[in-house]
Curated annotation (Swiss-Prot):
This is Valine--tRNA ligase, mitochondrial. One of its GO terms (biological process) is mitochondrial valyl-tRNA aminoacylation. Its EC number is 6.1.1.9. One of its GO terms (cellular component) is mitochondrial matrix. It is found in: Mitochondrion. Keywords: Aminoacyl-tRNA synthetase, ATP-binding, Ligase, Mitochondrion, Nucleotide-binding, Protein biosynthesis, Transit peptide. The gene is vas1. Gene3D superfamilies: 2.170.220.10, HUPs, Isoleucyl-tRNA Synthetase, Domain 1, Valyl/Leucyl/Isoleucyl-tRNA synthetase, editing domain. A motif ('KMSKS' region) lies at residues 556-560. One of its GO terms (molecular function) is ATP binding. A motif ('HIGH' region) lies at residues 67-77. Its main location: mitochondrion. The lineage of its organism: Eukaryota, Fungi, Dikarya, Ascomycota, Taphrinomycotina. Belongs to the class-I aminoacyl-tRNA synthetase family.
Length: 950
């Protein structure tokens, strides 16, 4: 574990603890995730970022997309928080006055649905509760899960502005919602209309598009809807007998026989010659005696679907309704708000429409009206909150007119930056096609719409409360609409309301908003729509989108698949037993719990080991290498663990030499070698700093993490460590000089990586490996103006890289004589890099081989000697190695090459097979990645063979 030592210097600066009275953290201890977290908990209060250059500098506002209070945070939330916090720290380290505001969303339909499911498990159903009783239960849920989410948010170590936390139904946000609605209503932009909506019968409410899940049904399947087995994937052919004819009939194709009682016409295409003679005649309704319905023709009919004859059920199909309006067809509703049949026959009235399906099919069979039933693929629209089948239903709703609003957004969108840039085309296209927004919901949880009906006049007015409504109605009786607002209405105002609107009108745009691609149009676009109207400018200057997080096989993360990973389980670790226990405590049906448990056993047989917050954050960044997808599994964090642990262990390694300062002078070779290493590593660090800065500015987050990784693992852990091993062991004076250079580099590097891995970087910056002279009151981002970052020495980089490559190449030799101190074997080196000679003694010590320089002419002479093998290090340097030192290397390389070629042939055979197109997308993706990996390995081996050719 760490040891903490307090120095009791009385020096202070601006009321902040200065370096001399901070906690020193000793770095001798082995890498320990929990211990690092303990250290961070102690020193975090001493992390301060530079103050703005001007007292009047504007705030740099950042808005967290608020998590729903439906349950725990998931990986998508964690990714957004990690990206936003890294950017927040990046800008804070540059002196910006960052205010990163966290909050939670009341999530109307989502929360009410999850609470109702929770109550049902206890045997309590919504129809048994009053409105106040249900709202009381939801409020209790809100308090519990809001507290849980806030604790989770704190565990991500983000620099949240906790003094300004928000909730979408707190007083300030509620006032903002009322202000916005009333203003839009009075401007004539909010109106009431009777139109088709996505209706969830179980919720008895309209739902937004994001709450509609489209399921592809490719073959007949039985699905359970509200515990009722229902068959989907069938096309039913039903005969309608022509009036006045005993042997003529028209056959209709439908996937929904349960709506047949609402049929008021049948339609054909005007281009279908088969049915032209029937247009204008009447047919008998198959199940309603004495009801004749007309045969009409309409261009909306697809003559290639089924029989080419369409049954027209106006009140339960948008297409049918439009056809009915054009032909003055009667409209009859056969379904109530709960999805139960009405205005049908006594056999099915009152039945749930899906339960009634099989009974109606039997009635058709009894009347010899069912011609056939054949398998048929279709898209099934399901409510993601309840699992019920969505119905197109015409009901009065409140709408926001968007024509003028979207035009204003599009006018300003040329100033808006979108990342990735491909999203711009979708952004513009969506706004152009956008229809009026249905903003009302028929549930109890949410912002009750501040609109009141004047009962005597059947007129609506908008007011924030009853008293104001009475005033506007001049004392006439008023009644508030019971509907609540769509959740997205309140969250769309957050760029304003989270920062003080409407009390404060001077709200500056967010520099950026970062979120998942899946809510670009449900949330981000609607923020633009509303906030542009109220502030006269777009609410953000940039939109940064990340893809949907999927598992390692490319599948969407789903509880039913058992592939959902709780971010806290990765950070803190979890046993398989506790993962299963969490499933039981959730809202999944027992059948899904068993299925998920089996998936968990397969994916996490040993549970998940604790990774800590830094490894988790860095691992998420490494997952961002593709703009279109994020494939996540526990292997995603192995590189992150290697990075963080290597950083700690590297500091431990050099820390042992910090007290070895010695007045003895360095030899010329040592001085030149260490100087070259210093200049080369500083130069590499210069590239890394510039690369990371550019990556953050261009929102290439994977690149930033990758540059950090390459510098640490290649330039420091490999090149610097290997080329200084001789010096740290040779003398105290050279060991201290190597440590001093490393310490200076580490100090800059820790600040460079701080935005992504704040804990370990903060802890190490407060350790004694960083000299006191290097620390300051504020943690700023490295700049090229710093002394060591002014270095840009390409020559030193080339020399050092050649020295390292020579060392590694010679270490690969397998001669047992390598271990002999006598150095009986000589390797000849020809190079145009004169300073390379300063590394010869260090390389000789590490390899037990004698290095001897030769000219280009001597190289040609030795090449004629068949006892040497040419090894090309670079265009500047070649080695001539005794052949006896390569007894088996080329043989092994060729065997590996053959094995890889066989694997490649097998994959290519699979991917070129005729049936491969039907393979799941995750299989195709996996094979594609595997093929790329094999090709890279093949190329590496071919290069290795080339380097060792005679």
């Amino acid at each position: 574990m760490f040891h903490f030592q307090r120095s009791f210097s009385s020096r202070k600066a601006h009321g902040l603890l200065s370096f001399k009275n901070r906690n020193y953290i000793h770095i001798e201890a082995p890498f320990d995730i929990a211990a690092i977290q303990d250290g961070w908990n102690i020193i975090r209060k001493h992390i301060h970022y530079p103050k703005p250059k001007s007292i009047e500098a504007p705030m740099f506002p950042i808005l967290l997309p608020p998590p729903n209070i439906t349950g725990k945070l998931h990986i998508g939330h964690a990714l957004t928080i990690t990206i936003q916090d890294a950017l927040a720290r990046f800008y804070a380290m540059h002196g910006y006055k960052v205010s990163f505001r966290p909050g939670t969303d009341h999530a109307g339909i989502a929360t009410q649905s999850v609470v109702e499911k929770y109550l049902q498990k206890k045997g309590v159903y919504r129809n048994q509760l009053s409105k106040d009783e249900l709202l009381s239960s939801i409020h209790s849920w809100q308090v519990k899960y809001q507290k849980s989410i806030i604790n989770q948010l704190k565990s991500f170590e983000a620099i949240f502005d906790w003094d300004n936390i928000f909730y979408t139904m707190d007083q300030n946000r509620s006032e903002a919602v009322n202000e916005a609605f009333i203003s839009l209503f009075n401007a004539g932009l909010i109106y009431r209309a009777n139109r088709f909506v996505n209706w969830c019968p179980k919720l008895e409410s309209a739902v937004s598009d994001i709450e509609v899940e489209s399921q592809q049904i490719n073959k007949p399947v039985t699905k359970y809807v509200d515990n009722t087995p229902v068959e989907f994937g069938w096309l039913y052919e039903i005969s309608y007998q022509l009036e006045g004819s005993d042997n003529e009939q028209l056959n209709v194709s439908t996937t929904r026989p349960e709506t047949i009682f609402g049929d008021r016409a049948i339609a054909v295409s005007p281009h279908d010659e088969r049915y032209k003679k029937y247009v204008g005649r009447f047919v008998k309704h198959p199940l309603i005696d004495d009801l004749l319905i007309p045969v009409i023709c309409d261009n909306a009919v697809d003559r290639h679907f089924g029989t080419g004859v369409l049954k027209i059920t106006p009140m339960h199909s948008i297409v049918d309704y439009e056809i009915a309006k054009r032909h003055n067809i009667d409209c009859v509703s056969i379904m109530d708000k709960s999805g139960n049949l009405i205005n049908c026959s006594k056999e099915v009235n009152g039945m749930n429409r899906l339960k009634a399906r099989s009974k109606i099919v039997r009635l058709l069979q009894q009347r010899n009206r069912l011609v056939e039933q054949v398998p048929h693929s279709l898209i099934l629209s399901v409510c993601s909150r309840t699992g019920d089948v969505i119905e197109p239903v015409m009901v009065p709703q409140w709408y926001l007119s968007v024509d003028s609003l979207k035009k204003e957004v599009l006018k300003s969108s040329n100033k808006l930056k979108l990342v990735p840039s491909l999203a711009r085309k979708e952004w513009d296209s969506w706004f152009k096609k956008m229809g009026d927004w249905c903003i009302s919901r028929q549930i109890w949880w949410g912002h009750q719409i501040p609109v009141w009906k004047i009962l005597e006049e059947d007129k609506w007015i908008a007011a924030p409360n009853y008293e104001k409504a009475l005033q506007l109605s001049v004392g006439k009786s008023v009644s508030q609409d019971s509907d609540v607002l769509d959740t997205w209405f309140s969250s769309a105002l957050l760029p304003l309301s989270a920062f003080g609107w409407p009390k404060s009108k001077d709200i500056q745009p967010l520099p950026f908003i970062e979120s998942g691609q899946d809510i670009l149009f449900f949330w981000i676009a609607r923020m633009a729509l509303l906030c542009k109207y109220f502030s006269n400018e777009l609410p953000f200057k940039e939109i940064i989108l990340h893809p949907l997080v999927r598992d390692s096989e490319g599948r969407k993360m789903s509880k039913s698949l058992g592939n959902v990973i709780d971010p806290m389980d990765i950070i803190n670790g979890v046993t398989l037993e506790n993962m299963k226990k969490a499933l039981l405590e959730g809202n999944l049906p027992i059948s899904e719990v068993h299925k998920s448990s089996k998936q968990m056993e397969k994916a996490f047989p040993n549970g998940i080991p604790a990774q800590g917050i830094d490894i988790f954050r860095y691992g998420l960044f490494l997952c961002l290498h593709h703009e279109q997808r994020i494939l996540l599994d526990m292997n995603s964090f192995s590189d992150a663990h290697r990075f963080v642990s290597k950083l700690w262990n590297l500091a431990r390694y050099f820390n042992q030499y910090k007290d070895k300062e010695n007045p003895l002078k360095l030899t010329d070779s040592q001085r030149q070698r260490i100087s070259l290493l210093k200049m080369a590593t500083y130069s590499k660090l210069h590239h890394a700093v510039e690369g990371v800065k550019e990556s953050f500015e261009q929102r290439k987050f994977f690149n930033a993490a990758d540059i950090m990784k390459n510098f640490l693992l290649n330039d420091l852990s490999s090149v610097y460590v290997e080329l200084t091993r001789f010096d740290v062991k040779d003398s105290k004076s050279s060991a201290y000089e190597v440590y001093r250079v490393f310490s200076d580099i580490l100090h800059i590097f820790l600040k460079l990586i701080h935005p992504i891995v704040p804990c370990i970087s903060g802890v190490m910056l407060h350790s004694k490996i960083i000299p006191e002279r290097k620390n300051s009151e504020f943690l700023s981002f490295p700049t090229s103006q710093q002394e060591c970052l002014l270095v840009h020495d390409n020559q030193a980089e080339v020399v050092v890289q050649n020295a390292y490559d020579v060392l590694i190449q010679l270490r690969k030799l397998e001669s047992p004589l390598n271990k002999s101190p006598s150095r009986e074997h000589t390797v000849y080196i020809s190079t145009s890099l004169e300073p390379l000679k300063y590394f010869y003694d260090a390389i000789e010590q590490s390899t037990n081989l004698k290095l001897k320089s030769i000219s280009q002419e001597d190289t040609i002479d030795l090449m004629r000697n068949q006892t040497f093998i040419l090894s090309r290090i670079s265009s500047d340097t070649i080695l001539l190695v005794p052949k006896k030192l390569y007894p088996s290397k080329r043989k092994k390389l060729r065997k590996n090459l053959d094995d890889l070629q066989k694997k490649l042939d097998k994959i290519q055979h699979t991917t070129s097979s005729s049936g491969y197109e039907k393979a799941p997308s995750y299989i195709k993706l996996k094979n594609c990645e595997l093929q790329k990996d094999i090709l890279v390995k093949i190329q590496d081996i071919k290069q290795a063979l080339l380097n060792t050719e005679i």
